[in-house]
Amino acid sequence: MTSPSPDQVIRQEILALSAYHVPPAKDMVKLDAMENPYRLPPFLCEEISRIAADTSINRYPDPHAAALKEVLSTTLSVPAGMEIMLGNGSDEIIQIIMLAAAKPEAKLLTIEPGFAMFKMIATFANMQYIGIPLKPDFSLDIDRMLAAIERHQPSVIFLAYPNNPSGNLFDTSALEKIIEISPGLVVIDEAYHPFAGKSFIGRLADYPNLLVMRTLSKLGLAGLRLGLLAGRPEWLSHLEKLRLPYNVNVITQLVATKIMQHYDVLQQQADAIRQTRTRLRTFLENLNGIEVFPSNANFILFRLDGASQIFRLLQQHGILVKNLDNSHPLLKNCLRVTVGTPEENDRFCNTLQDLIAGN
């Protein structure tokens, strides 16, 4: 009997994919992944150590993560009557939504450039992907969006608010129009809410087809891999059927519950990031030949000639940013830098300034 080859078994669209690439970052100033650069204070680290030591890791975690859900609902101001579903990061939640909605010929609609996982997971789920370009300034082309919704009748619309990789908030009235005319679900991804201050989570009761997604990764808990989805129980009760058992491990549940009881610590760190974002933006704006785009997130998108070469030179100097050049026509010659600590930002700024002067 002849052994089957991968191309005989695996779907062609999966064979055509490239695996998501995470560049090596050992011993680098890591400014590429929108992580919170600050560690937790010593008193919290000590409490976490005690929690880990006392945890029965030989037992499965609470399958419903009830204690964690309770503190998250309160801390994040989830409206009464709404429920939350937890995921092993937001990526799992995105995948659950798409798997649930992937009827034959079902379509996912989003904007471009946007979060790369929307398109990738649409392929996983075998959904048709529709990407609507933003305007050159990365604002929402609302007329084009509304026309696309009318034409394609998407089952699900995903919109990041603020957007990644551009960092800007879309016009609220435009998003309201999209939610109102959509024939299916609209999922607002608020991964960067701590740095933006605006949210649709308080509007969940206003729109029966609205879901709001959050993550704790950008707040400072990226290593725990915890995302959440807030919305009406009639939606979440069905999505829960696709959530794998025990998807949020016991350490994540207990540690996140403890940290969320000290949410003010994370808020103070987010405040510090917003302040250093302003200083970083001002520095970049004063460099010759750089176009800096407005940001309501914990990163800044900027454009300069020879971006890919600058990216490689920064790497050689031990600094890792995100190279977006050639990833989308609107991102030609664009790099994205995460807001780091003041020391990390200074090293990046001084190195970038020297590289530009050397060119």
UniProtKB/Swiss-Prot annotation:
It catalyses: L-histidinol phosphate + 2-oxoglutarate = 3-(imidazol-4-yl)-2-oxopropyl phosphate + L-glutamate. The modification N6-(pyridoxal phosphate)lysine is found at K218. One of its GO terms (biological process) is L-histidine biosynthetic process. GO terms for molecular function: histidinol-phosphate transaminase activity; pyridoxal phosphate binding. It comes from the Bacteria. InterPro entries: Aminotransferase_I/II_large, HisP_aminotrans, PyrdxlP-dep_Trfase, PyrdxlP-dep_Trfase_major, PyrdxlP-dep_Trfase_small. Pfam families: Aminotran_1_2. CDD domains: AAT_like. Pathway: Amino-acid biosynthesis; L-histidine biosynthesis; L-histidine from 5-phospho-alpha-D-ribose 1-diphosphate: step 7/9. Its EC number is 2.6.1.9. Keywords: Amino-acid biosynthesis, Aminotransferase, Histidine biosynthesis, Pyridoxal phosphate, Transferase. It is an enzyme of class 2 (transferase). The keyword Amino-acid biosynthesis applies. HAMAP family: HisC_aminotrans_2. Belongs to the class-II pyridoxal-phosphate-dependent aminotransferase family. Histidinol-phosphate aminotransferase subfamily. Homodimer. This is Histidinol-phosphate aminotransferase 1. It comes from Nitrosomonas europaea (strain ATCC 19718 / CIP 103999 / KCTC 2705 / NBRC 14298). The gene is hisC1.
